[in-house]
Amino acid sequence: MGAQNTNCTMKFIDIPEDRQREAINTVALQTGLPPSSIEKDWWVTQVLKALHTLPYAEHIAFKGGTSLSKCWNLIARFSEDVDIALSREFLGFSGELSKTQISDRLRRAACSFVREKMQHDVRKALMDLGIRADAFSVDVVITPVTTTDPEVITITFHSLYEVSPYIKNTVKIEISGRSMMEPIEKKAINAAIDAHFSKAPFAEKPFEVNAVIPERTFLEKVFLLHEEFRKSEVRVERMSRHIYDLAMMMDSENKIADRAIHNEALYKAVLEHRRKFIGLKGFNYDELYPATLCIVPNDDIARLWQDDYKFMCEHMIFGQVPSFDELISKLSMLNEQIRQLNYRKA
């Protein structure tokens, strides 16, 4: 994959700015997204393309909410960040690992790789795609902590629009060496601009990425909710997206939710991976087995998340938008369905 030629003769950002705005506005009207989101989608797509032209592209996997929208078309939510799993075998860690190896050596190796090599590789890959060096910058905030995981590469791009606190002119790549790498599938993606103007001189053809299957993402979001609600201080900002994503996957035509929760091997694999590689302090991972799973927020948290969801609906979600009460109702139904499963720890 690393050797594929993904260049075209002209990049979208090379055409006159008035034509860029015109094209962006056309797609914005079609999708219901703000123009700045359409612009940012082009940059998110370029970042993904750059990542999948790296020499070690076979050792990365595209995961998280952005993969649900870009690869699987399961959610009508603009996802602005790119979550990447980096193979721990590629980093030199194979076989069974101790907690010390995970919490120190693996995290340190991933952090070092991102800071010392990957950020520079991404910058070169974007330029190799034909993007002018003055159109973007690449940065990693270097802190004294050398075990940061996930580590973040930030791409800041020149925007046609005034930067807002809701849709920033940055694409964040979150890279983790502790994530699961399997199961994945090859999926072809492209930017909304390219899909709409497929015959234009600047249009780029779809390209393949290594995408985590949505069933795994579904289970990871289920477990994340249970873990979150066990914390003394539950996060609020942009957290309601997880409930929305689960609800959309429950409604999907290809039965993502049913396939996820009834795949006992996958359920246990994701759970046990979180136990070993996430390992929240003081949390009993046996609680994630069906009999004790609790993914519905209490009334106090629900009120806070409802306000967060209102923000998400105004700025990040497009198309038909379910009410927050509908989301909670679906979540309660899902919780009951999972509770009826008889999976047990081996």
PLM segments and residue spans:
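Structured mid-to-C-terminal alpha-helical surface segments
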Residues: 1-60, 72-76, 88-346
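Glycine-rich beta-strand-to-loop/alpha-helix junction loops that act as flexible
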Residues: 62-66
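Betabetaalpha-Me/HNH-type nuclease active-site subdomain
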Residues: 69
